Amino acid sequence: MKFVIYYFYIIIFFFKSYLFAENKHPIILIHGFLGWGREEMGNYFYWGGSQDFQQNLREDGFEVYTVSVGPISSNYDRAIETFYQIKGGQLDYGTNYSENLNIIQKPINKDYKGFFPEWSAQNPIHIIGHSMGGQTARMLEKLLKLKIKDETSILLSNEYSGWIKSISTISTPHNGSTLVPIML
């Protein structure tokens, strides 16, 4: 039995680089319904409360960013806001969408520097979404793969395949929520 245990440790020692791969891609945190960004609640963080989850991950060597999207906006709006906060550029909800809902297509003061302007298929991201943030992440993945004809938005007029390495969700209502009937 001791031989088996020692053999196991030797295998782990020699192959640990294969067994425990390092993450080289940024992690994006997306808050849920009624959530907030890092700068919006003082020293109380959506991701960690009085503890700073983003900072803890950074101290462990990860590149991590938290987006701040509309707390009660649609997943479509939140996904587009997420895209521009990560990539950078003037927020653009799209021509058809803006005209159909009579909203401002390119809101003033929504021109983002971008957390990770290098974002591409060669530089993908990991997304962690909590609650509605998971739905927002899935909508973003859908919009990245969608190319809309006659659209001028950078996001909606191009197809971006392979830009998301993984999506992890925490308490996301993927099949809907029982909250809606209660609220109506």
Model regions and ranges:
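Serine-dependent carboxylesterase/thioesterase catalytic core
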Residues: 31, 83-86, 90-184
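Short, flexible coil/linker segments at or flanking structured domains
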Residues: 7, 18, 70, 115, ...
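Intrinsically disordered, low-complexity boundary segments flanking structured domains
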Residues: 14-15, 51-54, 154-156
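Active-site catalytic motif of lipid deacylating hydrolases and related acyltransferases
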Residues: 22-125
